[in-house]
């Protein structure tokens, strides 16, 4: 690999990183201290979600992406998990929908109000139950609508269709893996699933059947993260001498890597990020303050080192803005959101290509890119179809082009209407999880779970109602529902006070008995 940028004439060889000032960053964010090797941050053009540290459960913040300055300490959060949140991911085709996974063995799907989180959200739209141990990884399908992939410490990969009816869903596909998964990545069209396991081997699977297509042998490269980069695979890990490495693979032949390159002797995990439009690969280390970037090609030497962004503040995790949210007039080609735990800071970092004409759309920097519309439904993918992403131009005013025939929307797809919302809210009190899930026999709730999987912390403002006013009859039912929720909350508060009083009396009785024993 060439380490001299002058040896490779690339229009990206002068890319530089521009960090936002503290006034334009997110200050005062209580970033999670979890040791799990995840990004802990997800971004779309509307919101940024950051996993936070909290007691008594798991939560994450959802802030407007244009928020500036300090975040209030009592900022409302999304806090429906009963254990620590391990990862969050925005739906690529719905900027108001986000998925989260947790140590409580569940995956939850949340609806975020268009005006932002004004009240604490404690009830999810969907709860996905199927894993018997903590869920560490989630990924949305890149081209199919409402299709989610999750991986847990039970050696299982599950595929979910979140467009199905019901508050609690079962997986539509369940794959068994030979080892614990450390990283998963779907190909650009979602046809293949690459994974990195605890035995440090790479595997390529067919996600519908779970059949292993390729498996790497015992090489000197011990992979910890894997990423699909066009028609190639990129993995990061360590060598047998504990030197951090990056490797490039042919997904159709994992017997030997195409390229192995040692980087340094640091111990932090390297997160790979790939931009398919510019063919640039970014390597950011957990606990590092630097980000290396390269240009990836399909011919030798495969990787061309460009340059490096350096900072004195180490990052714990990173989020990435989709291409449709970049500042194209400022020649911004990539944007990170660095989680700096020492400063309780989320710092935007823009990768910029210097150009003489600023404020003009540069067509050579922004080819057609993946848009915000799905190429097919979840059922179409499950039936065996494969489609690439629908492309859009980043030029202001351009629209997404659809080369596939239009289909009439199926019933039940899209966001729930007012009637569905009302029925879901009225049925919430008596909602129970199905008892006929044959594939959940190994699932056991931990000590942090509430008995019966009930939701005692429900509040009348846990979900935002639709902006369109419902008909009068539905409005009356909704008012009755909220009134009942108020009564339930008051009774719950009274019960909590009684329990506190009982505990106090028990302690007083115990102290009196101890005094009497000491006296006699």
What residue ranges belong to the model's regions?
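WD40 beta-propeller repeat blades
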Residues: 127-302, 306-325
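Structural motif
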Residues: 57-62, 109, 242-247, 288-295, ...
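Blade-loop segments of beta-propeller domains
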Residues: 69-98, 123-126, 133
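Acidic and/or Ser/Thr-rich intrinsically disordered tails and linkers
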Residues: 1-71, 217, 306, 325-482, ...
């Amino acid at each position: 690999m060439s380490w001299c940028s002058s040896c490779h004439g690339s229009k990206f060889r002068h890319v530089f990183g521009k960090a936002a000032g503290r006034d334009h960053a997110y200050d005062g964010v209580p970033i999670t201290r979890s040791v799990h090797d995840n990004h802990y941050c997800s971004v779309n053009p509307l919101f940024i979600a950051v996993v936070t540290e909290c007691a008594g459960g798991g939560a994450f913040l959802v802030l407007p992406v244009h928020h500036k300055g300090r975040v209030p300490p009592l900022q409302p959060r999304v806090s429906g998990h009963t254990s620590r949140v391990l990862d969050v991911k925005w739906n690529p085709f719905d900027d108001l929908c986000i998925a989260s996974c947790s140590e409580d063995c569940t995956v939850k799907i949340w609806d975020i109000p268009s005006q932002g989180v004004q009240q604490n959200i404690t009830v999810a739209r969907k709860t996905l139950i199927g894993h018997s141990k903590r869920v560490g990884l989630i990924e949305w399908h890149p081209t199919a609508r409402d299709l989610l992939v999750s991986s847990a410490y039970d050696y299982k990969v599950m595929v979910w269709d979140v467009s199905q009816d019901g508050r609690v869903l079962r997986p539509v596909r369940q794959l068994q893996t030979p080892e614990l998964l450390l990283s998963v990545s779907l190909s650009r069209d979602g046809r293949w699933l690459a994974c990195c396991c605890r035995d440090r081997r790479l595997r390529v699977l067919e996600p519908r059947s779970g059949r292993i297509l390729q498996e790497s042998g015992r090489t000197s490269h011990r992979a910890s993260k894997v990423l699909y980069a066009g028609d190639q695979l990129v993995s990061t890990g360590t060598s047998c001498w504990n030197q951090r490495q990056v490797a490039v693979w042919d997904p159709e032949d994992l017997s030997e890597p195409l390229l192995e390159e040692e980087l340094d002797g640091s111990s932090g995990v390297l997160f790979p990020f790939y931009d398919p439009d510019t063919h640039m690969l970014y390597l950011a280390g957990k606990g590092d303050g630097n980000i290396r970037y390269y240009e990836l090609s399909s011919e030798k030497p495969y990787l061309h080192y460009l340059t490096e962004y350096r900072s004195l503040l180490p990052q714990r995790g990173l989020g990435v803005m989709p291409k449709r949210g970049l500042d194209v007039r400022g020649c911004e080609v990539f944007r990170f959101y660095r989680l700096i735990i020492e400063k309780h800071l989320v710092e935007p970092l823009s990768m910029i290509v210097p150009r003489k004409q600023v404020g003009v759309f540069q067509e050579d920097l922004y080819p057609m890119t993946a848009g915000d519309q799905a190429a097919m439904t979840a059922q179409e993918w499950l039936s065996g179809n494969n489609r690439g992403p629908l492309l859009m131009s980043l030029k202001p005013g351009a629209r997404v082009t659809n080369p596939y025939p239009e289909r009439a929307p199926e019933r039940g797809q899209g966001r729930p209407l007012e009637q569905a919302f009302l029925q879901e809210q009225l049925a919430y009190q008596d909602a129970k999880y199905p008892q006929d899930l044959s594939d959940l026999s190994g699932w056991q709730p931990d000590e942090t779970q509430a008995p019966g999987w009930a939701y005692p912390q429900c509040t009348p403002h846990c979900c935002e109602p639709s902006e369109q006013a419902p008909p009068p009859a539905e409005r009356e039912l909704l008012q009755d529902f909220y009134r009942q929720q108020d009564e339930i909350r008051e009774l719950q508060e009274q019960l909590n006070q009684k329990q506190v009083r009982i505990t106090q009396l028990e302690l007083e009785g115990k102290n009196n008995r101890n005094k009497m024993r000491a006296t006699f």
